[in-house]
Design a protein with these regions (language model features):
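Alpha-helical structural motif
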Residues: 9, 17-21, 121, 159-166, ...
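Nucleic-acid nuclease catalytic cores
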Residues: 77, 83-177, 189, 193-195
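Glycine-rich, flexible loop/turn motifs
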Residues: 12, 149, 207
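Residues that form generic nucleotide/phosphate-binding pockets
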Residues: 16, 27, 162, 166-169, ...
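Short, intrinsically disordered, charge-biased short linear motifs at domain edges
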Residues: 3-6, 169-185
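Cysteine-cluster motifs in flexible loop/terminal segments that predominantly coordinate metals
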Residues: 19, 178-220
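Metal-dependent nuclease catalytic cores that hydrolyze phosphodiester bonds in DNA/RNA
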Residues: 1-104, 204, 213-220
Length: 220
């Protein structure tokens, strides 16, 4: 039986949705390469996760860097922000009067995307909050630094099903120690691991010849 201490990182579902190979290189092979976008994003998350900034504004309680775990997904991680709104249908919180409805807020450096990678990470956080607080979390929000706008996300059954399916696949691949092959596409240009992944290698009819050619080019 897997211990919660050994659960995979919840943030990995965003990597997994973007590219399964990228996820494996980061979370399985422990490889990482930072570019300007990832560095700026890391600094942004450092600010979000300052737990000393927990605050209360009237009927709104803001918790930063809140640790969450989902036994159903076998994922764990930190929510950038969880907003607790005072609500008669909410849940009780230790040390707080009244009832509170949780809503996760994920912070991202760029702008809203067509794919659901960011939304799936938010959904996984919500599913973890539901397990921990025994409540229903039907919505969340993503704040995009580049546009300075929040995107409201409805946590639909379809999004939840996709999150569960991906979490299951992540755990299976991790247990096998398997790194998927590259599937080159436009998304590779935005990937910080492009030089480690070598997606161009998988587009060659003869990968061995491709490697020999580039080794010879770099030879003194």
């Amino acid at each position: 039986m897997v211990s919660p201490d050994d659960y995979l990182l919840m943030s990995g579902i965003q990597h997994f949705s973007f590219c399964r190979r990228q996820w494996a290189l980061i979370h399985l092979e422990q490889q990482w390469s930072e570019n300007q976008r990832t560095a700026e994003g890391r600094l942004q998350h450092t600010r979000c996760h300052d737990v000393t900034l927990t605050e209360k504004r009237g009927d709104l309680l803001i918790a930063r860097g809140m640790r969450v775990v989902s036994h159903r997904l076998k994922l764990t991680g930190d929510c950038d922000v969880v907003e607790f709104h005072k609500d008669p249908n909410g849940v009780s919180l230790q040390g707080r009067r009244g009832l509170w409805q949780p809503m996760p807020v994920e912070y991202k450096h760029g702008r809203s995307k067509v794919n659901d990678a960011d939304r799936l990470q938010l959904c996984a956080q919500a599913m973890a909050l539901e397990e921990m607080l025994v409540c229903e979390v039907s919505e969340g929000e993503i704040f995009y630094e580049e546009t300075r706008q929040r995107e409201h996300v409805s946590l639909t059954p379809e999004l939840r099903s996709t999150a569960q399916t991906m979490a299951d696949e992540m755990n299976r691949l991790f247990a096998r120690g398997y790194t998927p092959k590259s599937k080159p596409g436009k998304h590779c240009n935005a990937c910080s691991l492009k030089e480690l992944c070598l997606p161009a290698l998988y587009q060659q009819a003869d990968p061995a010849a491709y490697l020999r050619e580039h080794i010879e080019e770099g030879a003194p």
